[in-house]
Amino acid sequence: MSFLSIFTFFSVLISVATTVRFDLTNVTCKGLHGPHCGTYVMEVVGQNGTFLGQSTFVGADVLTESAGDAWARYLGQETRFLPKLTTIASNETKNFSPLIFTTNINTCNPQSIGDAMVPFANTVTGEIEYNSWADTADNASFITGLANQLFNSTDYGVQVASCYPNFASVILSTPAVNIFGKDDTLPDYCTAIQLKAVCPPEAGFD
């Protein structure tokens, strides 16, 4: 794969950027501690069966190495082997899994996003990322309390958005998810959405 192809592929990922609002007040999941405690998935309002989650894809560096090296990296569970793109998609989308949000059992406050990796936002694109190597990059910064920001975006002065500025939707068939300031004007190729918390079993997830 040529350098130009690799550069084009990753520029597509970066250039892709739906405003998010969260409300836990009307959610009651059976068998959980309290009416608003436990684990939730976030469904897009008005788009039945579309959730906030992650899509995985094979990185360009993997495509340029031998099958033996790639297999060894896979068996070693190297996170960089399958980078994750935070996105919105349906339950039936291939290589997609919803993000599971967990609340504190004592306070019911959002405390974590179900991935074991620490999420952060790219300070250039604002994109939420989980890739293991990118958190050391110059253009990346950790977000303190990201789960709380996502659950209560208006209270924390942020907008969460997804956009299709070019042919990225054709290649990946999905937008990326980005964080913007509350007063930022979103690009005209962005579409505002709302998310609501739903119980995983009710959403079709075990």
UniProtKB/Swiss-Prot annotation:
Protein induction: In zinc-depleted conditions and has increased expression in NAP1 deletion mutants.
Signal peptide: 1-19
Family the entry assigns: Belongs to the VEL1 family.
Locations listed in the record: Cytoplasm, Cytosol
Keyword Signal annotated: yes
Keywords recorded for this protein, A-Z: Cytoplasm, Glycoprotein, Signal, Zinc
Protein name: Protein VEL1
Gene Ontology CC: cell periphery; cytosol; endoplasmic reticulum
InterPro entries cross-referenced by the UniProt entry: Vel1-like (IPR019435)
Keyword Glycoprotein recorded: yes
Residues glycosylated per entry: N26, N48, N91, N139, N152
PTM comment, free text: N-glycosylated.
